[in-house]
């Protein structure tokens, strides 16, 4: 039994609040335990220079943590004049993950910007951001089609992400901050709706981990992602 009382294969309580923002095409607040992230999707009629004139769209992402999202105040990166390496890594992960489930030709010469702002951090902010970003992106595409800006749906798959790790010798699903900070292995799995993998990140914090341990984490992650897909469908089909 984990410190939180969860079983090794148990996700934290999850909720998705749809459309908290009124000025974007799509938005949601995802809550996974005490990790809360605001995700929004905004459509612009410009694309990066390398795509101009190609009648193809783009999806990119920005990620940030509010100063009060952790126990000690985080300095705003804007005030420091540059983004940290972790921020850049996470927003690139979110962006390329979203592009994997989009037919960019069907988007036309438009860019969708995903914004992920961490309101409260208790582990798994990047995976929560990806899972919530899909919901925001889905709502944005729905809005663009309703307005007849898009004629066909460019979304080709669901997407969700979840963390796994080896903690005190045991494979566990969806690590909170205390588990993550003391885990022997920390990994993140990004899945498409059919169960195929989009990205895997895995790091041994103390000593190398075995293939058997990796397979065990993969199985846990796949089951966790299936639960996330089910929740996404429930909230989106109910609107």
Curated annotation (Swiss-Prot):
Output the superkingdom of the source species. Bacteria
Q: Which PROSITE patterns match?
A: RIBONUCLEASE_PH (PS01277)
Coiled coil ranges (UniProt) are none
Set out the biological process GO terms recorded for this chain's protein. Answer: rRNA catabolic process; rRNA processing; tRNA processing
Which Pfam families does UniProt cross-reference here?
RNase_PH (PF01138), RNase_PH_C (PF03725)
**InterPro entries to which the protein is assigned, alphabetical:** ExoRNase_PH_dom1, ExoRNase_PH_dom2, ExoRNase_PH_dom2_sf, PNPase/RNase_PH_dom_sf, Ribosomal_Su5_D2-typ_SF, RNase_PH, RNase_PH_bac-type, RNase_PH_CS
Which residues participate in phosphate binding? 86, 124-126
* UniProt keywords, alphabetically: Nucleotidyltransferase, RNA-binding, rRNA processing, Transferase, tRNA processing, tRNA-binding
The reaction(s) annotated as catalysed by this protein in its Swiss-Prot or TrEMBL entry are: tRNA(n+1) + phosphate = tRNA(n) + a ribonucleoside 5'-diphosphate
NCBIfam families per the UniProt record, alphabetical: RNasePH (TIGR01966)
Q: What family does this belong to?
A: Belongs to the RNase PH family.
**Name of this protein:** Ribonuclease PH
Which organism does this record belong to? Rickettsia akari (strain Hartford)
């Amino acid at each position: 039994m984990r410190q939180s009382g969860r079983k090794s294969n148990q996700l934290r309580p999850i909720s998705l609040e749809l459309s908290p923002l009124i000025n974007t095409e799509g938005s949601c607040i995802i809550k996974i335990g005490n990790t809360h992230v605001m995700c929004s999707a905004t459509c612009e009629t410009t694309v990066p220079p390398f795509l101009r004139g190609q009648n193809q769209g783009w999806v990119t992402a920005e990620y940030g943590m509010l100063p009060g999202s952790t126990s000690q105040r985080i300095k705003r990166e804007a005030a420091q004049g540059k983004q940290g390496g972790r921020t850049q890594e996470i927003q690139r992960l979110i962006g390329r993950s979203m592009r994997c489930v989009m037919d960019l030709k069907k988007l036309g010469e438009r860019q969708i910007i995903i914004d992920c702002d961490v309101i409260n951090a208790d582990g798994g902010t990047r995976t929560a951001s990806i899972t919530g970003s899909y919901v925001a992106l889905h709502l944005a595409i729905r809005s663009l089609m309703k307005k007849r800006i898009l004629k066909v749906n460019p979304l080709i798959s669901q997407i969700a992400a979840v963390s796994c790790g080896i903690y005190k010798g045991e494979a566990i699903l969806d690590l909170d901050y205390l588990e993550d900070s003391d885990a022997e292995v920390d990994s993140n799995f990004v899945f498409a709706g059919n169960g195929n993998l989009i990205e895997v990140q895995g790091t041994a914090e103390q000593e190398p981990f075995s293939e058997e341990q990796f397979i065990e984490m993969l199985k846990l992650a796949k089951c966790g992602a299936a639960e996330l897909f089910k929740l996404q469908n429930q909230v989106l089909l109910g609107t």
